[in-house]
Amino acid sequence: MTRLFRLCKIIFVILYHGLDQLALSGFKSRRIRALVWVLTLGRRQTRPRGERLRLALEQLGPIFVKFGQVLSTRRDLLPPDVADELAKLQDRVPPFDPKIAAAIVERSLGKPLSALFHRFDHHPVASASIAQVHFATLRGGPDDGREVAVKVLRPGMLPVIDSDLALMRDVATWMEKLWADGKRLKPREVVAEFDKYLHDELDLMREAANASQLRRNFAKSELLLVPEVFWDWCTSEVFVMERMHGVRVSHADELRAAGVDTHKLARDGVEIFFTQVFRDGFFHADMHPGNILVSVAPESLGRYIALDFGIVGALSEFDKNYLAQNFLAFFQRDYHRVALLHVESGWAPEETRVEELEGAIRACCEPYFDRPLGEISLGLVLMRLFQTSRRFNVEVQPQLVLLQKTLLNVEGLGRQLDPDLDLWKTAKPFLERWMHEQIGWRGLVDRLKIEAPQWANMLPDFPRLAHQILERHARDNGSAQTATLSALLAEQRRTNRLLSAALLFIGGFAVGIIATHVLAWLARH
């Protein structure tokens, strides 16, 4: 019954904001089109469609606001005006009762509040749809007296989320079957992505692990501070981390007054982003101004401070390599290389005609590159590329969409601090150095160090595995095993070539050292 009432409310909000016309106009059925005409007869909507959608999501509550925020990152699927409007959604809800927050902390950690903290501020400093944050001072153990931020999960979220997600899945299924653009927009995939995103956010231990990983990655960095995680005070409902002090990155005048070089700060932000993406393959994916502070303490003046680790992105070595090559090809205006990389990486279907994709990419990107480099937005270039990719059935990877959204945030922050920020001038040396390390001799030697022991371990088993496959082939008279054997033989040949190259390299290196010592001995005698 509750679900039925919720559905009725959703339908009412859709009708109130005139979204029925927007939603139903894309359906294939003539009957539905006729229904649209009847329902909208005499109704006039003065607000743009994107604004109406944003207002409807805000009226439906925090879960739908979250959904709109996630949807705003899928610029490969949405019209630009709708995506821009959804990006304005703010995840702000009234705080829940501090007594309930204290009770959750006590139940989750198994101790009274007075045994856990010297002080616990009952007035929350931040409140969102998933959790709210209180400041406190730890009691007991080696961290006694440390100032911390306590993030507490909002109670009763799971039933509400599951109910709304069930409705979203039903609507997505209908859309995919009946809507003309249903298959292209992949509504069920979008809802499934949102489902995973929400359930990840409901586990604060996951967020604590993200914070710990990022802190470890930047432990020796002079650019970024990440709060320490206090694991003994962390559960799936409570996340306790070091309290950080700083000025919001968007308050540029206040930062300058404190002696921070905002031009350097803008460049540092770009370097932090590319370091996360290409060095670590793990990046903070929610870098809006509310989640970034800047330290004004004398010992760490001008260092960024990261907060809120609920959304992170990860890239494989494969993705990092192709992404770096794409960026370099973009700024060399080598559109053929960009198109070729899309096909080679599997992002575009194998049957894609490279020349056609190249022409579409040129038409998409050339208007941007006619501007001065300081005015070029890498994030917007990626966004336009995703939109162009619709025509070629290019499968946009979720991690790349997260990266594009984060890059837009980084650029926006950077140009608030320094309007003349040349993103490419800052990023290019980093990318070229990374590519040299990965693809040059150093990268080859590093990979050989990692892979050679594994290859050496596998080689003795190869004859036995080949014999087993041949026996199975003889029994089953199948062809799949032959293909497997061929693949194994190809792998064996490739392994032999790589090992030979490694031995040749090591041998040459050894000969060089011996020759150097011999020449030195001859020179002395």
UniProtKB/Swiss-Prot annotation:
Residues annotated for ATP binding in this entry: V125, A126, S127, A128, S129, I130, A131, Q132, V133, K151
EC number, UniProt record? 2.7.-.-
How does this protein lie in the membrane?
Single-pass membrane protein
Offer a single GO CC term for the protein.
Answer: plasma membrane
**Subcellular location as annotated:** Cell inner membrane
Query: Which residues are the active-site ones?
Result: D286
Listed pathway(s): Cofactor biosynthesis; ubiquinone biosynthesis [regulation]
Q: Which residues cross the membrane?
A: 502-522
Domain Protein kinase span(s) in chain numbering:
119-501
**Where mainly located?**
membrane
* Leader sequence segment: none
Does Isomerase appear among the keywords?
no
Q: Which GO terms describe its molecular function?
A: ATP binding; protein kinase activity
Which UniProt keywords are listed? ATP-binding, Cell inner membrane, Cell membrane, Kinase, Membrane, Nucleotide-binding, Transferase, Transmembrane, Transmembrane helix, Ubiquinone biosynthesis
Q: What processes in GO biological process is this protein linked to?
A: regulation of ubiquinone biosynthetic process; ubiquinone biosynthetic process
Quote the function comment for this protein: Is probably a protein kinase regulator of UbiI activity which is involved in aerobic coenzyme Q (ubiquinone) biosynthesis.
Instruction: Tell me the protein's name.
Output: Probable protein kinase UbiB
Name the species this protein comes from.
Ralstonia nicotianae (strain ATCC BAA-1114 / GMI1000)
Q: What is the lineage of its organism?
A: Bacteria, Pseudomonadati, Pseudomonadota, Betaproteobacteria, Burkholderiales
